[in-house]
Amino acid sequence: MKNQYRVLLYYKYVHIDNPEQFAEDHLKFCKDLGLKGRILVAGEGINGTVSGTVEQTDRYMSEMKSDPRFEDMVFKIDESEGHAFKKMHVRHRDELVTLRLEDDIDPNELTGKYLEPKEFYEAMQQEDTIVVDARNDYEYDLGHFRGAIRPDIKAFRELPEWIRDNKEKLEGKKILTYCTGGIRCEKFSGWLKKEGFEDVSQLHGGIVTYGKDPEVQGELWDGKCYVFDERISVPVNQKEHVIVGKDYFTGEPCERYVNCANPECNKQIICSEENEHRYLRGCTHECRVHPRNLYVKEHGLSEEEVQERLEKLKEEEHAAQS
């Protein structure tokens, strides 16, 4: 039967004593329940995505809410046809989201104004408003709010420097910020306020909540939302689907992410199935001929077959240029 599984996305900024021990105990608890997923635990709180059956996820939410620290924690729930992860990991970290600020931000003390989906939808359309995507470039490239700024960053910790370098774009504007589930914006919007930006708001519950809201139904979102599990992406806009992703090799509309087959590169690229085969899932010629190319290994290709494909590719590229 379809959709017997669920994926839970959640976070909570709350003080956790002895987070290392908590992480160890929590891993056992999750494994005993039969869950799979990835959970980060820090002194400042918890951030997780787990998958399991309806019964397993219900038990998990019930147990978590029975702990006074997590009794008001919001769980974002997605139906799924199976597990979204291969294993169960609970890891201790210094920070739930890595900003590495000299003076850390506690979102319970300083954060941007929370906007519910309808409020965010309306605010995006107002004058003197700038919408800043608080995610990484590869997340933006798969989908984003219409007109949102794409910070040129590969990791969240690079965002403060990018903001400082582009301060003139934001000064005197109303700033709206958003991320997948809301956790990055809790800190980022607080940091913006600390930097002197006065009018800062964040999408409460993130893109995931916006896409499920019965009123806005994901409107003004183009593309899909990147997620950090085996689903890779989830739909957001229930009214219209606009593909914004572009194939790495041809620039054609595409929403399929793969990792470069060279394990030393592992770059994420948007790529059609056809082009994955044509380019041996290598983002460059060097990656295609790499001795440890995983595509070659997975498909059991001989050296002769690899050479044949590379020659064909060379001919196609030569023909396209002439």
Swiss-Prot record:
InterPro entries: Rhodanese-like_dom, Rhodanese-like_dom_sf, Rhodanese_C, TrhO, TRHO_N. Its EC number is 1.14.-.-. The active site is at residue 179. It catalyses: uridine(34) in tRNA + AH2 + O2 = 5-hydroxyuridine(34) in tRNA + A + H2O. GO terms for biological process: tRNA modification. It is an enzyme of class 1 (oxidoreductase). It comes from the Bacteria. Residues 125-219 form the Rhodanese domain. GO terms for molecular function: oxidoreductase activity, acting on paired donors, with incorporation or reduction of molecular oxygen. Keywords: Oxidoreductase, tRNA processing. Catalyzes oxygen-dependent 5-hydroxyuridine (ho5U) modification at position 34 in tRNAs. NCBIfam families: PRK00142.1-3 (NF001135). Belongs to the TrhO family. This is tRNA uridine(34) hydroxylase.
